[in-house]
Amino acid sequence: MTKSNGEEPRMGGRMERLQQGVRKRTLLAKKKVQSLTKEDVKSYLFRNAFVLLTVTAVIVGTILGFALRPYKMSYREVKYFSFPGELLMRMLQMLVLPLIISSLVTGMAALDSKASGKMGMRAVVYYMTTTIIAVVIGIIIVIIIHPGKGTKENMYREGKIVQVTAADAFLDLIRNMFPPNLVEACFKQFKTSYEKRSFKVPIQSNETLLGAVINNVSEAMETLTRIREEMVPVPGSVNGVNALGLVVFSMCFGFVIGNMKEQGQALREFFDSLNEAIMRLVAVIMWYAPLGILFLIAGKIVEMEDMGVIGGQLAMYTVTVIVGLLIHAVIVLPLLYFLVTRKNPWVFIGGLLQALITALGTSSSSATLPITFKCLEENNGVDKRITRFVLPVGATINMDGTALYEALAAIFIAQVNNFDLNFGQIITISITATAASIGAAGIPQAGLVTMVIVLTSVGLPTDDITLIIAVDWFLDRLRTTTNVLGDSLGAGIVEHLSRHELKNRDVEMGNSVIEENEMKKPYQLIAQDNEPEKPVADSETKM
């Protein structure tokens, strides 16, 4: 009884303190609202103009797109209508190439080999951890919800799929890391293609054939050989920036420049200036971004097929992917950021709002890269040495949303075909989905191409990818947003873990500047002593 009586006053005291705290905060909020002036409102709107305009563009674009759907616009009319959005994509893609190269070179050059090695290891561990978690979430969600229940005969198919083997895709990934021509890597990447070739195969002789009497020699040759057709891999290329090759080269180049000390100073200054110039161009393009996003979203909604085809299994598949991406983006990534940094992840994510909306509109993590740089460095104050190193690499190889989608979609296709996967096959899917997401380019709908590798690894029919193409344009935007969020939070985590190395580097740079100035002083004094004294002209001489 005594214990319960003692607890009641404590509970009452806590409730009173809580109520007092709520009252104080309410009064403070009222005072702030009452003290607001027109200037305060204007300054707030000006500071958040980009975000407000971008959010408005998404809402207006969605409404406009659905409003224009009943007019059944032709393909040509849709292309004309989407032209402002196409211009935005072109502007952003124009800046991606110089931005990746300049940011990586300057980022690596600003770090010593020890710091860059530690930072690189932390970034890789983060990338692999989040990608594996995303794959596991995708597999668990699709097994629990089971969206593929039923048959595939009633499902809508769209498009054709190009076959590719897992071995060739993996070798292409390695080949693209080492481009033979850097100029060509700016607009082309290696891709194995297949062509049909005929081979003459000798037929083993048997007793019947040996016993036969053949008078004609040519007839004998035709009898002893047969023609076999086979699809063989041949070297090829596809249009598009070889981002992986440029990332590898830029990192190595920046590392070498950083170790060249004074000899590399001119190159460091050049790439620093280039990076600064690109970021100023980004600041200009950001004002056009809301208009471009509006027409991109509206045009895509007008262009999409009849909503009637998205029913049953496909609707459940769409819901399953959205749930998986939400769990990863809203719960896992912020929780990981909080556990490592002990900071509020939602404040950090708030500074990324425009980058996330741009990713939703453009459906390309590479095209969003300039905006992501701007948001992280200006809104969230992330060290430029971190963003220049982590973001270009992350936009190339860290694709959490793509990995989740590929694992989930592969098991969905297995369910549609009533194909029971064992534990070993699920592990195979998880490994290949992780590897395939690394090789997926940061371009729209790149996940569909790498999906072939995942399906081939467990013997699933690759033609069934056509079952999910109808909704991929929408899911691709959500995947891209998740990818950009993962890269950005990764930059924040790596900065927190590398703060001591960055401080030490700042101290070293400060000491080196002081030493240089001290070294210059004796020479300046000697030069001053050796200078002949100039006669001082008086006013009379001047006159």
From Swiss-Prot:
InterPro entries attached to this UniProt entry:
DAACS, Na-dicarboxylate_symporter, Na-dicarboxylate_symporter_CS, Na:dicarbo_symporter_sf
Q: Where does Na(+) 2 bind?
A: 396
Q: Which GO terms describe its biological process?
A: auditory behavior; cell morphogenesis involved in neuron differentiation; cellular response to cocaine; chloride transmembrane transport; cranial nerve development; D-aspartate import across plasma membrane; gamma-aminobutyric acid biosynthetic process; intracellular sodium ion homeostasis
Sites where the protein binds L-aspartate = 363-365, 402, 443-447, 476, 483
Reaction catalyzed: K(+)(in) + L-glutamate(out) + 3 Na(+)(out) + H(+)(out) = K(+)(out) + L-glutamate(in) + 3 Na(+)(in) + H(+)(in); K(+)(in) + L-aspartate(out) + 3 Na(+)(out) + H(+)(out) = K(+)(out) + L-aspartate(in) + 3 Na(+)(in) + H(+)(in); D-aspartate(out) + K(+)(in) + 3 Na(+)(out) + H(+)(out) = D-aspartate(in) + K(+)(out) + 3 Na(+)(in) + H(+)(in)
Record PTM: Glycosylated.
**Where in or outside the cell is it found?**
Cell membrane
Q: What is this protein called?
A: Excitatory amino acid transporter 1
Q: Composition bias, kind Basic and acidic residues: at what positions?
A: 531-543
Q: Which molecular function term from Gene Ontology is one that the record holds? A: glutamate binding
Intramembrane stretches, as ranges?
A: 346-376, 426-459
Region (Disordered), start-end ranges: 522-543
The portions of this protein that span the membrane are 48-68, 87-108, 123-145, 237-260, 270-297, 319-340, 386-412, 473-494
Entries under Gene3D superfamilies matching the protein: Sodium:dicarboxylate symporter
Q: Which residues lie on this side of the membrane: Cytoplasmic?
A: 1-47, 109-122, 261-269, 341-345, 377-385, 495-543
Domain remarks in the entry? Contains eight transmembrane regions plus two helical hairpins that dip into the membrane. These helical hairpin structures play an important role in the transport process. The first enters the membrane from the cytoplasmic side, the second one from the extracellular side. During the transport cycle, the regions involved in amino acid transport, and especially the helical hairpins, move vertically by about 15-18 Angstroms, alternating between exposure to the aqueous phase and reinsertion in the lipid bilayer. In contrast, the regions involved in trimerization do not move.
* Chain positions with Phosphoserine modification: 512
Chain ranges on the Extracellular side, renumbered to this chain:
69-86, 146-236, 298-318, 413-425, 460-472
Q: What GO cellular component entries does it have?
A: cell periphery; cell projection; cell surface; neuron projection; neuronal cell body; plasma membrane; synapse
Recite the UniProt keywords alphabetically. Amino-acid transport, Cell membrane, Chloride, Glycoprotein, Membrane, Metal-binding, Phosphoprotein, Potassium, Sodium, Symport, Transmembrane, Transmembrane helix, Transport
Sequence similarity: Belongs to the dicarboxylate/amino acid:cation symporter (DAACS) (TC 2.A.23) family. SLC1A3 subfamily.
Q: Where does Na(+) 1 bind?
A: 394, 398, 483, 487
Cite the record's tissue specificity text.
Detected in brain, in Bergmann glia arborising into the molecular layer of the cerebellum (at protein level). Localized in brain and is highly enriched in the Purkinje cell layer in cerebellum. Intermediate level in lung, low level in spleen, skeletal muscle and testis.
Superkingdom in the source lineage: Eukaryota
- Note the subunit structure: Homotrimer.
